[in-house]
Amino acid sequence: MLTIALDAMGGDHAPKAEVEGAVRAAGSLGVKVILVGQQDVVRRELEQHEGHRDLPIEIVHASERVTMEDSAAKAVRSKRDSSMRVASRLVRDGCAQGFVSAGNTGAVMATAKMVQGVVPGVDRPALLGVFPTMQGNPVVLVDVGANVDCSPEMLAQFAVMGDIYSRNILHRRNPRVGLLSIGEEEHKGNDLTRAAWPLLKSLRINFIGNVEGRDMYAGNVDVIVCDGFIGNVALKVSEGLVDMFKKLLRESLEATISGKIGYALSKSALTNFRKRLDHSEYGGAPLLGVRGGCIIGHGSSNANSIKNAIRVAAEFSGGKVNQQIEEELLRLGKAGD
């Protein structure tokens, strides 16, 4: 049974959402969850869930908590007994196979890189985002915020890591990998994308060339590569569009009697539609290139988000993603020597 260490004090709704998500995961996913946080607080929350004693859940005490206002440096250097750091340490020490936190993103990344270490061959770990498409198959975007400034070589590594993730976790047989730019032609883009293009072309991946922002939801590409600045903007725009679309749809349906009747008749279909757009269904963003695996949840994660983040962490570990990343980057390094 895989064991996942969960930062029970991270996120806007901690520890309630974290504990409920852990209970759901332990009860349905066949994984053990270690809740890391202030023991009395976490235990009190856990006692609210009937049957929790029969589930593979353990509590590990951590006296400190990293807040959303803490800098990454403060989280790493000053709060040595934070729930975030203790959870990461459990992975480093082999007590858990994955680390999940919905806390301060910068602090989680800094903690995971320092405590767990980086996979050999990886220059910079990258955050991967998963998005729905019109074709039904999800697309992944790498990087969505870990590295705002990137080199062409880093984008090439992101392409390799995204390809491996898509194959092993999303089960795409031959993922189509595209480089995000402002035009499909090879010469389009900025200095970074033009320099990265031939590097991606030389890789053992199904590189389809440049793709544009509109391709992100079309379903004609499986992995999109970009620097973390552009990726994070795309992520936040997507979240805003989903919120706006849900609001406008609800207002339109509630505006007239016929709309209300239509809503009642199509409630099941609309529920499934909302589910496809709900970021909580995707759990969290894997930090690719960190030893042991690290999944970073949205700060507003609810119990469903936490459960799915634990699921992603278990799939990541079970799919041996890091092992394949290390092997492929080692091969590329030798080929370049």
UniProtKB/Swiss-Prot annotation:
Pathway noted in the entry: Lipid metabolism; phospholipid metabolism
Gene Ontology BP annotations: fatty acid biosynthetic process; phospholipid biosynthetic process
Enzyme Commission numbers on file: 2.3.1.274
Reactions mediated catalytically: a fatty acyl-[ACP] + phosphate = an acyl phosphate + holo-[ACP]
InterPro entries in the record: FA_synthesis (IPR003664), Phospholipid_synth_PlsX-like (IPR012281)
EC top class, as a word: transferase
UniProt-listed Gene3D superfamilies: Isopropylmalate Dehydrogenase
Protein name: Phosphate acyltransferase
Organism for this UniProt entry: Solibacter usitatus (strain Ellin6076)
